[in-house]
Amino acid sequence: MFKVGIGYDVHRFVEGRKLILGGVEIPFEKGLLGHSDADVLVHAIIDAILGAMGENDIGRLFPDSSPNYKDISSLVLLKEVAKLLEEKNMKIVNIDSTVVSQRPKISPYTNEMKNKIADCLKIESTQVNIKGKTTEGLGFEGREEGISAYAVVLICE
Ligand code: CDP
Ligand code: ZN
């Protein structure tokens, strides 16, 4: 049996934080605000996986109110989700995702992101796809106020 899931996330830019996307630190003049490392791509992927599993969402599994998750690497959360998948005997077929940011361009970093995400999920990096997209200056991403990310995942059981 196959199950599909969708994930979406947004974080706003702030001064004085590192920019972490797909577990990779990207040199940029500002970072994303959030309780964890605010890795908007990994959060969208986690929500897509949880969606496919029928397991609510990232905020319910890892509450903002918990000090355990303050400034935590979102890759740690992704590994937790990988454990849940294993417990349920579910396997990821593939992940596709889009990061929407006017700047920075992410394509120089997507191979490293794919490797990190695949490692956490114990899958091949060829099962993970990451695309970058601008909005041609339109909307909050275009004004460089924040970054959004979309992900879909197919899992089989
Ligand atoms: O040309 P089109 O409108 O389809 O795409 P775009 O948003 O102008 O982006 C052009 C190319 O830049 C994309 O195909 C990506 O390869 C790259 N890109 C990126 O790496 N990171 C982003 N945040 C946005 C775009
Ligand atoms: Zn998030």
From Swiss-Prot:
Q: Does the keyword Phosphoprotein apply?
A: no
Print the organism lineage.
Bacteria, Bacillati, Bacillota, Bacillota incertae sedis, Caldicellulosiruptorales
Q: Does the keyword Signal apply?
A: no
Q: Which cofactor does it need?
A: a divalent metal cation
Give the positions of the site Transition state stabilizer: H35, T134
Query: What Gene Ontology terms describe what this protein does at the molecular function level?
Result: 2-C-methyl-D-erythritol 2,4-cyclodiphosphate synthase activity; metal ion binding
The positions annotated for binding 4-CDP-2-C-methyl-D-erythritol 2-phosphate are D9, V10, H11, H35, S36, D57, I58, G59, F140, R143
Broad class of enzyme this protein falls into: lyase
Q: Which PROSITE patterns match?
A: ISPF
Gene3D superfamilies cross-referenced by the UniProt entry = 2-C-methyl-D-erythritol 2,4-cyclodiphosphate synthase (3.30.1330.50)
Protein's pathway: Isoprenoid biosynthesis; isopentenyl diphosphate biosynthesis via DXP pathway; isopentenyl diphosphate from 1-deoxy-D-xylulose 5-phosphate: step 4/6
Biological-process GO terms, alphabetical: isopentenyl diphosphate biosynthetic process, methylerythritol 4-phosphate pathway; terpenoid biosynthetic process
Q: Which residues pair up as cystines?
A: none
Q: Cite the record's note on assembly.
A: Homotrimer.
Belongs to which family? Belongs to the IspF family.
Q: Which residues bind a divalent metal cation?
A: D9, H11, H43
**Reactions listed under catalytic activity:** 4-CDP-2-C-methyl-D-erythritol 2-phosphate = 2-C-methyl-D-erythritol 2,4-cyclic diphosphate + CMP
Please state what the protein is called: 2-C-methyl-D-erythritol 2,4-cyclodiphosphate synthase
Top-rank taxon of the source lineage equals: Bacteria
The record's annotation in PANTHER family points to: 2-C-METHYL-D-ERYTHRITOL 2,4-CYCLODIPHOSPHATE SYNTHASE, CHLOROPLASTIC
Functionally, this protein is described as follows: Involved in the biosynthesis of isopentenyl diphosphate (IPP) and dimethylallyl diphosphate (DMAPP), two major building blocks of isoprenoid compounds. Catalyzes the conversion of 4-diphosphocytidyl-2-C-methyl-D-erythritol 2-phosphate (CDP-ME2P) to 2-C-methyl-D-erythritol 2,4-cyclodiphosphate (ME-CPP) with a corresponding release of cytidine 5-monophosphate (CMP).
In the UniProt record, the signal sequence range is: none
Keyword annotations:
Isoprene biosynthesis, Lyase, Metal-binding
User: Cofactor binding mode, per the note?
Assistant: Binds 1 divalent metal cation per subunit.
- Give the originating organism: Caldicellulosiruptor bescii (strain ATCC BAA-1888 / DSM 6725 / KCTC 15123 / Z-1320)
Enzyme Commission identifier(s): 4.6.1.12
